């Protein structure tokens, strides 16, 4: 497999873009080599500048649940764009999107559109503080909630990949009101409530911790969080940027049967376009300006092109509930197949799958970081060279889409088995 054009593009990019990329993990620093520059995508396949074809399990990091270039989404975007790209004013499309989300997710009575998951989380936290008149937020080690200053503490995703648990430029003041608990450990949360009595505004959690690999919640963990937040009169925020409209049409709340007070969304709700949203109970959301005193705004929020792509995606999912059955079945086939091939730990929830390069059980940040990242790098490059594109990080999920087929799963497992069949995977 040649990457000559991608190499040239990467060298050009490094002269004008920090690290040559617009998101750190894309630089392949954790796995080595040159990142392929992608030219086009269709269904479950992506194609790079050199003409190489890959079965894609990144899916733009989650949004492409229907597969790339889905006809319904492309048609919706094409019809909308001829009327204009952005107005900076209210449109019917943003009303339709909000109505659709509130219909599909009963716990969300009102919703506000933004442009990214980071914006959604940043805004939801501000709303939680404004509503409760409290300052402190509990998050979990290894969970990633975007790159707002107050959330860049013990994070997952790219920062975890690069060995940066915090970030330069984040002041002690910005992070002082963020408290860290241990994922899947309700006692660690109770202790923080005891130590900060009456001053915790909210607990924010990824219902499935999908930015330190894929770490499912233990039995009753989410239920216990719900009970504890009710008892302490704090809000429970579900970060469903990844799980929203993926695990089920109602997201993780429907999948696990636990409702949050506020929910953040991104990825799938944009159908591939830059979109985020946050929503929740009416009484909480009415704290947001111009109704309330919690200020949040955005020039491109509710962009009509993004709304049309998102509406088309959500309607396709709603009108075809068999999609969830199919992607969850494929996810199970993939995870069970991986589990038979390798001695290492495989975790999955629905269409989210991860192989941890450790033989220990993985339930939290501390156990996830025991993974052999060097081995993962060799595994990644073996798959890449054999036409299988997964995230260039041990601590990210494989995303199965409705465009994947059983044949794709079989081919993927065959390529994986070739790697692990070697007594000593190459250095």
Swiss-Prot record:
GO biological process, one term: protoporphyrinogen IX biosynthetic process
PANTHER family reported in the protein's UniProt record: GLUTAMATE-1-SEMIALDEHYDE 2,1-AMINOMUTASE, GLUTAMATE-1-SEMIALDEHYDE 2,1-AMINOMUTASE 1, CHLOROPLASTIC-RELATED
Keywords, alphabetical: Cytoplasm, Isomerase, Porphyrin biosynthesis, Pyridoxal phosphate
HAMAP family: HemL_aminotrans_3
GO molecular-function term, one example from the UniProt record: transaminase activity
Obligatory cofactor(s): pyridoxal 5'-phosphate
Principal location: cytoplasm
N6-(pyridoxal phosphate)lysine found at: 267
Pfam family, one: Aminotran_3
Disulfide bonds: none
EC number: 5.4.3.8
Catalytic activity: (S)-4-amino-5-oxopentanoate = 5-aminolevulinate
Subcellular location field: Cytoplasm
Gene Ontology CC entries for this record: cytoplasm
Gene: hemL
Protein name listed in UniProt: Glutamate-1-semialdehyde 2,1-aminomutase
Quaternary organization: Homodimer.
